[in-house]
Swiss-Prot record:
Modified residues (O-(phosphoribosyl dephospho-coenzyme A)serine): 14
Protein name: Citrate lyase acyl carrier protein
Quaternary organization: Oligomer with a subunit composition of (alpha,beta,gamma)6.
Any one Pfam family match given in the protein's UniProt record, by short name: ACP
Lineage, highest ranks first: Bacteria, Bacillati, Bacillota, Bacilli, Lactobacillales
Domain of life: Bacteria
Function as written in the Swiss-Prot or TrEMBL entry: Covalent carrier of the coenzyme of citrate lyase.
Cellular component GO terms, alphabetical: cytoplasm
Location relative to the cell: Cytoplasm
Length: 97
């Protein structure tokens, strides 16, 4: 699926993550800012990439500002951002949840 509009989910509070999705052209590209990037960079990207795959998103620019979020928080924020970006917020795809 193509991203229809830029969308964001999350906050910059401690133990949260802010994810912004916008249209991409060359696959999925990441701009990740995190104090724990050295240790969890790959895990954060893998979680978000898996959510994008569930929705069939192949091209996206992903900006992530992580403040120590747990994996389940990252997944929930990614799902919210994707639904908003695809204009599906009013009609969530329950099968991917």
């Amino acid at each position: 699926m193509e991203i229809k509009k830029t969308a964001m989910a999350g906050t910059l509070e401690s133990s949260d993550v802010q994810i912004m999705l916008s249209q991409g052209r060359d696959g999925i590209t990441f701009d990740l800012v995190s104090d724990v990037a050295k240790q969890f960079d790959d895990a954060i990207k893998a979680t978000i990439t898996a959510v994008l795959a569930l929705y069939g998103v192949d091209n996206a620019e992903v900006k992530v500002v992580d403040k120590g979020a747990l994996d389940m928080v990252i997944k929930a924020r990614a799902m919210t951002a994707v639904q908003r970006a695809l204009d599906l917020a009013d009609e969530p795809n329950w099968e991917v949840m």
